[in-house]
Every structure is written in structure tokens, then in C-alpha cells.
């Protein structure tokens, strides 16, 4: 079993100023190729701490991947840290210097002297070409038969180099991995785990649960000598999980909840009216071909022109089931869609956390409600997901699970 660790380097990552999307990408990539990731570390731009982290990682793992810290400035210290951890001395590589100078010349510029450190190499390192940036990576084979990979921080550069330069060099496991992720909605992770029972405690195939914004995911994975054998090993457990969770399932693997709604619409167009959710629902639907039109507003006068009646507004308020029903019907009538979906949400005041969603198909209406206090972003996200879940389950004639 090949063990891997990820070390993300950057004070901006440590303080949360930038989300570490690189580590998430690498974790998925490692898992898909049968490598076992057992630790992720985030460190600021500190030479001593990064050096120590590399040494510790090498004592535990076969593969250590560092992201970030390959720029030209004084606080870009990944090269120095790897060299210190391996007790090697970096020197300028003439070929890399020539490549960097040519890169700047092609852009009509002269290479700043500060960029010369990006041409450093240590004896055990091989330079990884960077086709979209100025920071070459490192591929290091240690005396202890371990591998260190250093990649730049910008995601576009890192992902390109990982696929084109790192993967062909990695000693990947010979055993094959087959994994399927099932998406559920309307059931909590603890209840789901109880239903799965002993399945979550077996090793191969393994069954694991993950809470996400759109519900709870269940990953079934098996490893074997061949892809076919791994698929066959996973199949009976996967079927059992599907049967156990059938009433909550909406998709698998790369499916999105918005995509599931599109499939359920079956070529019918969808109109959306949002009040209080700041376009959160429209953002999720933006790339879907059946998404016809939308209105995002909290202005009462505008909402009245879209179907909200003054009687409902004054008697029950904007954040009410009846208001959602009227606006869902209004999405059909005023936006010219075949199906209308509306969400009304309160993100502040006494009713903060309350939301109502409604779906109007022309033949029937369906509603669901939410009461989940949190910050404004969380409330809007939950309301948008609830609206999609309502649409998917109603259009496929499933029980609505708010």
C-alpha cells in the first residue's frame, strides 16, 4: 500500500485568506488511483516548520506532495525546505535559467534577477516543466526510495503539471480501485449510518459517508488485482446500499442536484423567482439547459407584478408558504416557463433561518419549509438546495423530504 501525505505551504492558506482547493483536488486524484492519503498539513511560510514537516512526512509516507512556495520571492521557501530536509544544496540549473529567460523574452520582457531561484535544483531532484507559469516543479527521489513532489500554488498550474508531468512518473499501485459515490438528500448522516449498519465497518469493499451541502454522499470502494475484479467485488455491496437508501437517492458520481432536476424536467423549461436568497438558486442552475428565466428581487412592488398578492403579503408576509406558492405560479405565468420554482427566505431579523420553497407544474403545486438558523450565506445555500430537492423529488413523484 502506497501511503501519501500532502503539505500545503502558504501563510494565506493557514489564515484562511485563500481556500486550499489544491489539497482537495490532490486528495481526489490520489484516491482515484489507489493511493492512501493519511494526512494533510497546512503551514505558513516558515522554513524551519516546513523543513520539519517534510522530515516527519518522509518518516510516515512513501509519497510527499508539497503545494505552493515555488515563487521567486523570499517567502517562497519550499525549495529551501526540501533541500534542508534532505541535507542537499540547491544550485542554479543552466537549462532552467535558459528556459526562464526565453519565457520572459517571448513576452517582451527581461527576466528579473529575483526569478533565478526558480531555476534551482538539488542533486536528487528532476525539474517538472510548467507549461502555464514561471515556476518549475520538483520530482525528488530520496535515498530511502521515497518520492517528494513540489508543485506551484496556482490551481491551473498545479493541476496541469500533476496530470501531464507527475502522474506519468509516479509508481502507482498495481492493484485496481473501483469506487462509486451515491448522492442522497433528506436524511442526516447519523441516521444514514445507522441504516447501513455493519456495511460501514467492513474494509474491502469499504462504505463511507460524507456530509455535503447537497446532502450526504456514500462512497463504496473496492480494490482487487484487475478493474473487472474490483468492480465485481463492489457490486453486491453497492446494490445493497442502493436498495437501503433508495428513497433518498438522487444521483451518483459526477451527477449534480441541479442536473437531476434537469433530467426530471424532461425538456420542460424552468422559471425561478427568488426573494431573500440573493440568487443562490440561480447560481446552482446557471449551466442547466432547461433553465429559462429568473427574477431575483426583494422589492415588494416588483414581486406583486410577478404574482405575489397584496393580501398574502400583508396577512402572512413575504416569507410564507402562500407567498412561495403564488410566486411559483407567477414564475410560470410571468416568465413564460412550463414549470415554476420559487424560494422566499429570511436571513435576518426574528425570522432569520426560515425559508419556504414551492414548485408549480401547472397541474399541481408542491411546497417545503426550512427553519435552520445560521449566517446569511448558509441560510441561502440551504434554501437553494431545498428548492432543488423539492423539484427533483416532486417531478419524479417521490415523497418530499424537507
Curated annotation (Swiss-Prot):
Pfam families: CinA (PF02464), CinA_KH (PF18146), MoCF_biosynth (PF00994). SMART domains: MoCF_biosynth. It comes from the Bacteria. Belongs to the CinA family. This is CinA-like protein.
